[in-house]
Regions:
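Bacterial Sec-dependent N-terminal signal peptides
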Residues: 1-25
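Beta-propeller blade signature
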Residues: 68-78, 124-136, 191-202, 248-264, ...
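Conserved blade-ending motifs and adjacent loop-strand segments that build the rim/top face
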Residues: 90, 266-280, 317-342, 401-423, ...
C-alpha cells in the first residue's frame, strides 16, 4: 500500500460540547487476507435474515495485475457464510472495459458492464447476472452504440470533457432502477443517449436528448429517476447568448428536462443576480428540488444555500430561495462573525430525513503542487498534495429554509490514498452522523470550540459526531487505534438501514466493521 502522511486538524464550534454517549453497537469480522491489496465496498444489501450480502471490487497493484469482484455473504455477527471471486476477463476483441455499477433484484446480482468491441466497432453495454446462491453469471446485452457516434474513445467513463462526463451511471434511492447517459458526438448540438432500466433489467426509456446549442455551451449536471420509475430528470447548465448579456449574476441558465417514453419537456430557471456554480436534483413524490451553493461574487465562491422547487409533472417553478449561511456557521468556521465567502467546496452527498428534510453535505477540496529540483541536476519532478479540509453540512426544511448549518473545520491532506481521511455521513431519525478518523486528544479552543488532532492516518481513532435536530453537536470515540489490527477507511463507508459498513486494510490484511446506530 502506498505510504503517505495525512495531517488532520478538526475544530467544531459547539455550545457546551462535550464527549457524550451516543448509542451504537459494533461488530467486526475476523481479520482476513485477499490476494489483492486494494479493495473497496461497492454494494451492501440485507439478506432478510439479519445477515448481509457485500460486494467488494478489487484491483491489482504494481506487481499484481487483475481486477474483479468479491461476493460475500455474512451472518448477523459478520461470520462468513459463503464467498465467490469473479475475475474480470476480456476477450481479444473486447477493449477498454469498465463496470459502471452493481444492482440487485432479490437474490439476483448484476454487474453493468461497458466494453468496446473491436470487431463490431461499437460500445456494448451488458448485464452480467447471477443468483447469489450459485454464482453462474449470464450475459445479457442491454444496448450498443457505434464508435462513430461516441465523442471520444479513450476517455469513455473516465475523463471529463467540456464539463460533461462521457458516461454517467446512477441508481435511484430505492435501488429499483438505474439510468445511463452517454455523451454523443455532435459539435453543433448537445446530444446525450439516455437509458432507463428497472432492476429486473427491463428497458423503460431509450431516448436521444438534444439541445440546440454548441456542445461546449452545455454543462451536464446530473440525472435522477422519478419515484414511479417511469421518468428521468436531466439537469444542465447552459451558457446562452441571451444570458451572456446579463449585467449581474451568473451568465447562464439552468434547464431541467423531464424525459419519458413520450419525449421530453424542459423548464428554464435563472439564478438572478446571484451565482450558483452547480446544482443537484433531488426527487420527491410531490416535488422536485434543485439545491446547491450560491455566491454574490462569482461561481465557486460560497455564501449560502440556493433552493429551487418545481412541480414533478408540469415542471412549473413553485419557489426559489437564497439562504445565507447562519451566524452559527460563520462562528464555527472563523471563531467570530465576519462577512466572508467560502471557496473550493465539493459536493459530497444528500441525505433525506423521515420528514423529507434535506441534509446537504460538502467538503472543502483542492490540490496543491510542488516542484522539486534534482540535487544532481537534470531537471526535477512534481508532487501533488490533495487537501480535504472543512466539512459543510446544512439541513433544509420542506419550505426551502435553513434549519441549521454547521462547519466542521479540519485540515487533511495526502499525496496518496485518501481512503482513511475525509468522512462518511448518514442519518437516523432526525439526527445526522459523521464518521471520522481522529487523533489521541481532544483540545479545547476559544469560543467553546474543540479540535481533534492527527498526524498519521495509519494510526487513527474512529469517532462519530452527531448533530441533533436543533443543530447541536456531540461526539464519541468508537474505536481506539490500539484495539484495531487494521485502520478503517472512513471515506468508503456503505450504508444499509441503520448500519454503516467499513473495510479496514493494512497491507493484505483486511477486516469488515459494522456500526449500528
Amino acid at each position: 500500500m502506498k505510504k503517505f502522511i495525512a495531517i488532520l486538524c478538526i475544530s467544531l464550534s459547539i455550545n457546551g460540547l462535550q464527549a457524550q454517549e451516543i448509542p451504537n453497537s459494533i461488530i467486526k469480522s475476523e481479520v482476513f487476507k485477499d490476494e489483492y491489496k486494494h479493495s473497496s465496498i461497492v454494494l451492501v444489501e440485507d439478506d432478510g435474515n439479519d445477515g448481509v450480502f457485500i460486494v467488494r471490487s478489487y484491483a491489482g497493484g504494481l506487481f499484481s495485475s487483475g481486477a474483479g469482484y468479491y461476493f460475500e455473504h455474512y451472518d448477523s455477527n459478520l461470520k462468513l457464510i459463503k464467498e465467490y471471486e469473479y475475475e474480470m476477463k476480456r476477450s481479444e476483441t473486447e477493449k477498454q472495459g469498465s463496470i459502471l455499477g452493481v444492482i440487485m433484484n432479490g437474490d439476483q446480482v448484476s454487474l453493468i458492464d461497458l466494453v468496446y468491441n473491436t470487431n463490431d466497432k461499437a460500445y456494448v453495454c451488458s448485464a452480467l447476472t447471477s443468483s447469489i446462491t450459485d454464482f453462474n453469471f449470464v450475459k445479457k446485452e442491454l444496448f450498443r452504440i457505434s464508435v462513430n457516434d461516441i465523442k471520444k474513445v479513450h476517455w469513455f467513463g473516465a475523463n471529463q470533457l467540456d464539463g460533461d462526463y462521457g458516461t454517467n451511471f446512477m441508481v435511484n434511492e430505492d435501488k429499483t432502477a438505474f439510468a445511463i447517459t452517454i455523451d454523443i458526438k455532435d459539435k453543433d448540438t448537445e446530444t446525450h443517449k439516455v437509458f432507463l432500466f428497472d432492476n429486473k433489467l427491463n428497458k423503460k426509456i431509450d431516448h436521444d436528448f438534444k439541445r440546440d446549442i454548441k456542445d461546449k455551451k452545455f454543462v451536464y449536471e446530473n440525472i435522477d429517476v422519478s419515484k414511479d420509475g417511469n421518468n428521468l430528470y436531466l439537469l444542465g447548465k447552459v451558457f446562452t447568448e441571451e444570458k451572456k448579456k446579463k449585467k449581474e449574476g451568473g451568465k447562464y441558465q439552468y434547464e431541467l428536462t423531464r424525459i419519458s417514453k413520450e419525449g421530453q419537456a424542459t423548464q428554464v430557471f435563472d439564478t438572478d443576480e446571484h451565482f450558483s456554480g452547480s446544482l443537484k436534483t433531488i426527487v420527491f413524490q410531490d416535488k422536485l428540488t434543485c439545491i446547491g451553493f450560491y455566491s454574490d461574487r462569482k461561481d465557486y465562491r460560497f455564501k449560502g444555500i440556493s433552493y429551487f422547487e418545481l412541480d414533478p409533472i408540469s415542471l412549473a417553478i413553485r419557489k426559489s430561495k437564497y439562504n445565507p449561511f447562519t451566524e452559527q456557521f460563520i462562528i464555527d468556521k472563523y471563531g467570530k462573525s465576519k462577512d466572508k465567502e467560502l471557496k473550493n467546496l465539493s459536493f459530497r452527498g444528500v441525505l433525506i430525513t423521515e420528514q423529507n428534510e434535506i441534509v446537504f453535505n460538502a467538503e472543502e477540496y483542492y490540490m496543491t503542487s510542488n516542484y522539486h529540483m534534482n540535487p544532481n541536476g537534470g531537471g526535477g519532478y512534481w508532487t501533488y498534495i490533495y487537501h480535504y479540509d472543512d466539512i459543510v453540512s446544512a439541513k433544509i426544511a420542506n419550505d426551502g429554509s435553513i434549519i441549521w448549518a454547521r462547519n466542521i473545520n479540519k485540515r487533511q491532506s495526502t499525496g496518496g490514498d485518501d481512503s482513511y481521511i475525509s468522512y462518511t455521513s448518514t442519518i437516523k431519525g432526525n439526527d445526522t452522523y459523521f464518521f471520522i478518523n481522529t487523533g489521541e486528544k481532544v483540545k479545547k479552543l476559544s469560543n467553546d470550540r474543540i479540535q481533534f488532532g492527527q498526524t498519521s492516518t495509519k494510526r487513527s481513532n474512529l469517532n462519530v459526531i452527531r448533530i441533533t435536530p436543533d443543530g447541536n453537536f456531540s461526539f464519541q470515540e468508537i474505536l481506539d487505534d490500539k484495539a484495531n489490527e487494521v485502520p478503517f477507511m472512513v471515506s468508503d463507508g456503505a450504508l444499509s438501514k441503520n448500519s454503516v459498513y467499513f473495510i479496514g486494510r493494512k497491507g493484505k490484511k483486511k477486516q469488515l466493521l459494522k456500526i449500528t446506530l
